[in-house]
UniProtKB/Swiss-Prot annotation:
Region feature Disordered, mapped onto this chain: 108-130
Site (Important for substrate specificity): 459
Organism, scientific name: Plasmodium falciparum (isolate 3D7)
Regulation of catalytic or functional activity: Inhibited by 1,10-phenanthroline, EDTA and bestatin. Inhibited by (Benzyl)Tyr-Ala (BTA). Activity is not affected by phosphoramidin, PMSF, leupeptin, iodoacetamide or pepstatin.
Family membership noted in the UniProt record: Belongs to the peptidase M1 family.
Identification of the protein by name: Aminopeptidase N
C-alpha cells in the first residue's frame, strides 16, 4: 500500500505516542516515565523541526490537524493521554505546532518540583487527571461545564469558570495573557474561542454524592490556620460510578483519607489547586467518611472571601464560592448537611469565638489557647457556614417568640470602641423578628442569634445561619457620628439578613441560577418591613428611584439579563441590581395580583412545602398559583405566563390611550405593552403585568372609583369602566405596581392635577418626573442643536409656569411628607435621564439641568429659603439625640429637605447663603455639617470647611468614609487635585472596600468632571480598577459600575470609555471576575 506524505507523517506521530504509552508509569499516574520524558519531547521537537523544512508540506498541512484527523480519542482508551493530549489537540488547532505537545510534556517537570500544593500559578492550566471525560451522565457537572462550541459565535476567555474568579490567597490567579490580543486596526480586543467555562441552567444535574454531616476543627494561629474536616458521605441515586470531585482553592494538603485510610497523591487522587479528584475505584460504594487536613492563610487573604482577617478579627465569607477556600467540599447550594464546628485560637487575641448554631461548650487549652464547639441542627448549604474569632464586645437582649414563647438570646458584636453604636441594630433586629411573626407567621428557630460588624467586607452583610456578619456601615450608627441614611440602611439590612432565615436558609436554592428566589424575595420582604417601620411615603419612592435609575440602565445595557440568568461564567458577577431589585418587584407583583390575604396563603404554602429543602423559582410560582386559584375560585386559573418575568430580560414599555363616551358614561383604557429585543433575546413575549389604577375627577381632584388592579396578559387589551359621570384622569400603576416604563400620554395639565391631588405618592412622583423629563428632553435638544450649529444665541423653551406653581403649592402644603417635597424639587437622576437620550453629550445635559434649576429657582428661591429656615427647629431638635433606640424618620426627612434646599440655594448663589452654610456646619448632626462642606464647593470657603469637617470625621472610620464620599462628589473644577489629595493623605494604601468605593464612586456621578472630554476621568477609574483587581476582584468589578452607560454616550466618549475597558482587558493578570464583566459589557462575550 502506497502512503502519501501526509499519511506517512500521521503514522510517525502515532508511533511516537505508542512509545509514550508503553512508558506510561502507572504507579505515579504520570504520562511518561520521568527519565524518558525529555527524550520523547526531543523526538517531537526534532520531527517538528524537520517538518518546518519540508517545503511541499509545511504550508498546506497543519501538524495539529493531522493528529486531530486521526481522531485517536475515538478508539484509544488510555484516559490520561486521551484527556491531556488528544482533547487539547482538538482545542488548540490554531496554536503554534510546537506549543501543544511540548508544553504538555515539559510542564510536568516543573510540577514535580512543587509538591506542596501551595498557590502555584503553574497549576492553573493543568488538566484534571483520573476523571470522566465528556460523560453525559456525569453528576459533577458543576465543575466540568463544557465551553461554548465555536458554532455559538460567542467570544470566550481562558478558564473563566464558576470557581476561578477570585484571587488565590497570595496573589492574583495567573490567566494566560495570550487570551486577549490587541487588534491595532480597530483598537478592539479579540478573545480566542473555546476558553471559558460557561455554566448553563439547563445542564443542572443532582450530585452523585451526599454529605450528611460535617465535622470541622478550625485551629487559628498567627501565620496559618489548620482546618480538619470529616464529611459523613454516601452515594446518591444519581451516582453512575464517577470520580469523587471536591472543590478546594489554594489549600495546602496535610492529609487526605477515606475511612481513616490515607490516600496517596497521584495514585488515588490528584489536586490541581482548584479541584481534588479521588478516582472512582477508590471511592466506597456505600456510606463512608472523607477526612482532610489543610493549611490556609487568612492573614494574607485580601480578596475577603473564604476565611480572612479584618483588622484583628478572623472572619469568613462563603457565599457564593468561599467555602472551598477553607476546606474541601462539594461546593454547591443543593449539598445540604448538618454542621458540628470546633474553633480554637489564642485566648488573649481571640477571646470571642463564634460559629453557626448553638454553642455546645467552651474549653481551655494549655499554652494560652481556648476553644468552643458549636452545633447547628438545621441542614444548610456550605455557603451559609460562618466563623468569627476576635476581641469583640457586645450588647445583648432577650426576645420571646410570639407563638411558642421561646426565649432567644440576641447578641450584636463590634470592636470595643464602637459598642455604643450597636443599640439601633439591636432594636432593628427585634423589630424584624416581630414583623416576620406578625406578617408571615414565622418564628426564629434557634436559641441564640449573633450579629457581628467587621470593617473589611465586600458587600453589605451575610445571612449565615445563626451568625449574621455585617459590613460595619450596615450595623453601626450613632446620631453624633453617623449620617441620617445610616439608620434607614441598618433597618433594611438587618431586616434583610434576618428574613433570609426562612427565604434562603431554611428554604434554600437548588442551584445558583435561582438566586433571585432568595435575594429578590428577601429584598421584597425587607421593603415591606421598612415601609411599615418608617411610615413614610419616601421609603417606597426610594426603592422605585433606585430601580428606575440603576436597574433600568442595566436592563438597556449589554449586561442586560433576566432575573434568573440562563448562563454564567463567574457567579459573583450575577449579584446584580436586576437579580435583587427587579427580582424584588417581580416578587412584589404577586402581592399586587393576589392581595394581602391570598398572598399570605400562597407564601405559607411555599414555606410548608419546601421547608428544609432546596427550591426553584417554579416552586414559588406554584405556591402563588394555588393562591391565585383560590382567589379566582377557578381551578383552571394559572400563572404559567408569569414565569416569563423570570426568563425574559429588558424593561417593558406600557403605553395608554383613552376614550370617554359621555352618553354611555363609559370610560375605556386601551393598553399596549412592548419590550425591545436585544442581542440575547431576539423575540420578546407579552408579560403578565398588573396595573393598579384609580380614576380622578378633574373638577375636584377626588377619587371616582375604588382602586382596582387590571391584569394585562396580552400585547394589547382594552379595559372598560361603567357609570363614570365625567371624563376622568387616569391614575396609573399606583404604588409602582410593575417595573415598567409608563407612557401615560397625558397632558401637562392632567399631570399637574395628579401631582397636586392624587392620593397615591408614586403617581404624584411619577407625574412630576414626567413633566421634568418632557422639559429636559426639549431643552437638551435645543442646547445640542445650538452647540452642533455653533449658534451664539438661541431660544430655550421656558419651564411651565403652572408646574412651578404646583411645586410651590406642594411645598407649602403642611400635610405633605417632607421627604416627598425633596423629590419634587429635584430633577430625575442622571442615570434615569440617560435611558431617554441616545448619544448623550454630558456637557449639554449639565447645561440643560442648570437652565431648568435656574428657571424654577428664579421663581421659588424665596420660598426655598423661607422653608429652609422654618423647618430648622423641628429638623434639628435634640430631644432624642442621645437615645439611640429612638429614631424619628419624619424628622430625618425634614433634615433631608433642608439640605436639599440649601444645595439649590447655594448653586443659585442666593444672597447671604454663605452665612447659612457656615452656621449649618455647626450642627451636631453629621448630615448637616457634611452638606455644608458639599455646598461650600460653590464658594471660597471650601477648604476651610474641608479641614474642619475632616477633623470631626477622622477618628471614626465610618464617619470618615462618609466624609470621603462628600469630598469625592464635590462639584469643583479642581476635583482631580482633590482626589489626588485624598489618595495621598487619607486613602494611602488602604485595601478596605468601603474606603476605595468612598473615594472614587461618588466622583463618577459628576456629569462634567468624570465625563471630561479628555477622557481623564475614565482613565483614572480604570487605573483604580486595575490596581484593585490585583487583590480584590469582586470590588474591582463593583468599581466598573460607571462604565455601564458607555454605549449611551456620544461617539467620542464611547470611544474613550471603550479604550479604557480594552486596556483593562489586556492586563496580563486580569481576574476572571473582571474579565467576564468587561467582555460582557463590551459585547465580546
Amino acid at each position: 500500500m502506497k502512503l502519501t506524505k501526509g499519511c506517512a507523517y500521521k503514522y510517525i506521530i502515532f508511533t511516537v505516542l505508542i512509545l509514550a504509552n508503553i512508558l506510561y508509569d502507572n504507579k505515579k499516574r504520570c504520562m511518561i516515565k520521568k527519565n524518558l520524558r525529555i527524550s520523547s519531547c526531543g523526538i517531537i521537537s526534532r520531527l517538528l523541526k524537520s517538518n518546518s523544512n519540508y517545503n511541499s508540506f509545511n504550508k498546506n498541512y497543519n501538524f495539529t490537524s493531522a493528529i486531530s484527523e486521526l481522531q485517536f480519542s475515538n478508539f484509544w482508551n488510555l484516559d490520561i493521554l486521551q484527556k491531556d493530549i488528544f482533547s487539547n489537540i482538538h482545542n488548540n488547532k490554531n496554536k503554534p505546532q510546537s506549543y501543544i505537545i511540548h508544553k504538555r510534556l515539559m510542564s510536568e517537570k516543573g510540577d514535580n518540583n512543587n509538591n506542596n500544593h501551595q498557590n502555584n500559578n503553574g497549576n492553573d492550566n493543568k488538566k484534571r487527571l483520573g476523571s470522566v471525560v465528556n460523560n453525559e451522565e456525569n453528576t459533577c457537572s458543576d465543575k466540568r461545564m463544557k465551553p461554548f462550541e465555536e458554532g455559538h459565535g460567542i467570544t470566550q476567555v481562558d478558564k473563566m469558570n464558576n470557581n476561578s474568579d477570585h484571587l488565590q490567597q497570595n496573589g492574583v490567579m495567573n490567566l494566560n495573557s495570550n487570551n486577549v490580543e490587541n487588534n491595532n486596526n480597530n483598537n478592539s480586543v479579540v478573545v480566542k474561542k473555546n476558553e471559558p467555562k460557561i455554566h448553563y441552567r439547563k445542564d443542572y444535574k443532582p450530585s452523585g454524592f451526599i454529605i450528611n454531616n460535617v465535622t470541622l476543627n478550625i485551629n487559628i494561629h498567627d501565620n496559618e490556620t489548620i482546618v480538619r474536616s470529616v464529611l459523613d458521605m454516601d452515594i446518591s441515586k444519581h451516582n453512575v460510578g464517577e470520580d469523587l470531585v471536591f472543590d478546594g482553592v489554594g489549600l495546602k494538603i496535610n492529609e487526605i483519607s477515606i475511612n481513616n485510610k490515607k490516600l496517596v497523591e497521584g495514585e488515588e487522587y490528584t489536586y490541581d489547586n482548584e479541584f481534588l479528584t479521588i478516582f472512582s475505584k477508590f471511592v466506597p460504594k456505600s456510606k463512608f467518611a472523607f477526612s482532610s487536613e489543610v493549611i490556609i492563610h487568612p492573614e494574607t487573604n485580601y480578596a475577603l472571601t473564604g476565611l480572612y482577617k479584618s483588622k484583628n478579627i478572623i472572619v469568613s465569607q462563603c457565599e457564593a464560592t468561599g467555602f472551598r477556600r477553607i476546606t474541601f467540599f462539594i461546593d454547591r447550594p443543593d449539598m445540604m448537611a448538618k454542621y458540628d464546628v470546633t474553633v480554637t485560637a489564642d485566648k488573649e487575641k481571640y477571646p470571642v469565638l463564634l460559629s453557626n448554631g448553638d454553642k455546645v461548650n467552651e474549653f481551655e487549652i494549655p499554652g494560652g489557647r481556648h476553644g468552643a464547639r458549636f452545633n447547628d441542627p438545621h441542614l444548610k448549604p456550605c455557603y451559609l457556614f460562618a466563623v468569627v474569632a476576635g476581641d469583640l464586645k457586645h450588647l445583648s437582649a432577650t426576645y420571646i417568640t410570639k407563638y411558642t414563647k421561646k426565649k432567644v438570646e440576641l447578641y450584636v458584636f463590634s470592636e470595643e470602641k464602637y459598642v455604643s453604636k450597636l443599640q439601633w441594630a439591636l432594636e432593628c433586629l427585634k423589630k424584624s423578628m416581630a414583623f416576620d411573626e406578625d406578617y408571615f407567621g414565622l418564628e426564629y428557630d434557634l436559641s441564640r442569634l449573633n450579629l457581628v460588624a467587621v470593617s473589611d467586607f465586600n458587600v453589605g452583610a451575610m445571612e449565615n445561619k445563626g451568625l449574621n456578619i455585617f459590613n460595619a456601615n450596615s450595623l453601626l450608627a450613632s446620631k453624633k457620628n453617623s449620617i441620617d441614611f445610616s439608620y434607614a440602611r441598618i433597618l433594611t439590612v438587618v431586616g434583610h439578613e434576618y428574613f433570609h432565615n426562612y427565604t434562603g436558609n431554611r428554604v434554600t436554592l437548588r442551584d445558583w441560577f435561582q438566586l433571585t428566589l432568595k435575594e429578590g424575595l428577601t429584598v421584597h420582604r425587607e421593603n415591606l418591613f421598612s415601609e411599615e417601620m418608617t411610615k413614610t411615603v419616601t421609603t417606597r419612592l426610594s426603592h422605585v428611584d433606585l430601580l428606575r435609575s440603576v436597574q433600568f440602565l442595566e436592563d438597556s445595557s449589554p449586561l442586560s439579563h433576566p432575573i434568573r440568568p440562563e448562563s454564567y461564567v463567574s457567579m459573583e458577577n450575577f449579584y446584580t441590581t436586576t437579580v435583587y431589585d427587579k427580582g424584588s418587584e417581580v416578587m412584589r407583583m404577586y402581592l399586587t395580583i393576589l392581595g394581602e390575604e391570598y398572598y399570605k396563603k400562597g407564601f405559607d404554602i411555599y414555606i410548608k412545602k419546601n421547608d428544609g429543602n432546596t427550591a426553584t423559582c417554579e416552586d414559588f410560582n406554584y405556591a402563588m398559583e394555588q393562591a391565585y386559584k383560590m382567589k379566582k375560585a377557578d381551578n383552571s386559573a394559572n400563572l404559567n405566563q408569569y414565569l416569563l418575568w423570570f426568563s425574559q430580560s429588558g424593561t417593558p414599555h406600557v403605553s395608554f390611550k383613552y376614550n370617554y363616551d359621555a352618553e354611555k358614561k363609559q370610560y375605556s383604557i386601551h393598553v399596549n405593552q412592548y419590550t425591545k429585543p436585544d442581542e440575547n433575546q431576539k423575540e420578546k413575549k407579552p408579560l403578565f403585568i398588573p396595573i393598579s389604577v384609580g380614576l380622578i375627577n378633574p373638577e375636584n381632584g377626588k377619587e371616582m372609583i375604588s382602586q382596582t388592579t387590571l391584569e394585562l396578559t396580552k400585547e394589547s387589551d382594552t379595559f372598560v369602566f361603567n357609570n363614570i359621570a365625567v371624563k376622568p384622569i387616569p391614575s396609573l400603576f399606583r404604588g409602582f405596581s410593575a417595573p415598567v416604563y409608563i407612557e401615560d400620554n397625558l397632558t401637562d395639565e392632567e399631570r399637574i392635577l395628579l401631582l397636586k391631588y392624587d392620593s397615591d405618592a408614586f403617581v404624584r412622583y411619577n407625574s412630576c418626573t414626567n413633566i421634568y423629563m418632557k422639559q429636559i428632553l426639549m431643552n437638551y435638544n435645543e442646547f445640542l442643536k445650538a452647540k452642533n450649529e455653533k449658534l451664539e444665541s438661541f431660544n430655550l423653551t421656558p419651564v411651565n409656569a403652572q408646574f412651578i406653581d404646583a411645586i410651590k403649592y406642594l411645598l407649602e402644603d403642611p400635610h405633605a411628607d417632607a421627604g416627598f417635597k425633596s423629590y419634587i424639587v429635584s430633577l430625575p437622576q442622571d442615570r434615569y435621564i440617560i435611558n431617554f437620550v441616545s448619544n448623550l453629550d454630558t456637557d449639554v445635559l449639565a447645561d440643560t439641568k442648570e437652565y431648568i434649576y435656574k428657571q424654577i429657582g428664579d421663581k421659588l428661591n424665596d420660598v426655598y429659603y423661607k422653608m429652609f429656615k422654618s423647618l430648622e427647629a423641628k429638623a434639628d431638635d435634640l430631644t432624642y439625640f442621645n437615645d439611640e433606640s429612638h429614631v424619628d424618620f419624619d424628622q430625618m426627612n425634614m433634615r433631608t429637605l433642608r439640605n436639599t434646599l440649601l444645595s439649590l440655594l447655594s448653586k443659585a448663589q442666593y444672597p447671604n447663603i454663605l452665612n447659612e452654610i457656615i452656621e449649618h456646619s455647626k450642627s451636631p448632626y453629621p448630615s448637616n455639617w457634611l452638606t455644608s462642606l458639599s455646598v461650600s464647593a460653590y464658594f471660597d470657603k471650601y477648604f476651610e470647611l474641608y479641614d474642619k469637617t475632616y477633623k470631626l470625621s477622622k477618628d471614626d472610620e465610618l464617619l470618615l468614609q462618609e466624609w470621603l464620599k462628600t469630598v469625592s462628589r464635590s462639584d469643583r473644577k479642581d476635583i482631580y487635585e482633590i482626589l489626588k489629595k485624598l489618595e495621598n493623605e487619607v486613602l494611602k494604601d488602604s485595601k478596605n472596600p468601603n474606603d476605595i468605593r468612598a473615594v472614587y464612586l461618588p466622583f463618577t456621578n459628576n456629569l462634567r468632571r468624570f465625563h471630561d472630554i479628555s477622557g481623564k476621568g475614565y482613565k483614572l477609574i480604570a487605573e483604580v480598577i486595575t490596581k484593585t483587581d490585583k487583590f480584590n476582584p469582586m470590588v474591582a468589578t463593583q468599581l466598573c459600575e460607571p462604565f455601564k452607560l458607555w454605549n449611551k454616550l456620544d461617539t467620542k466618549r464611547q470611544e474613550l470609555m471603550l479604550n479604557e475597558m480594552n486596556t483593562m482587558l489586556q492586563e496580563p493578570n486580569i481576574s476572571n471576575n473582571l474579565k467576564e464583566y468587561l467582555l460582557r459589557l463590551t459585547n465580546k462575550l
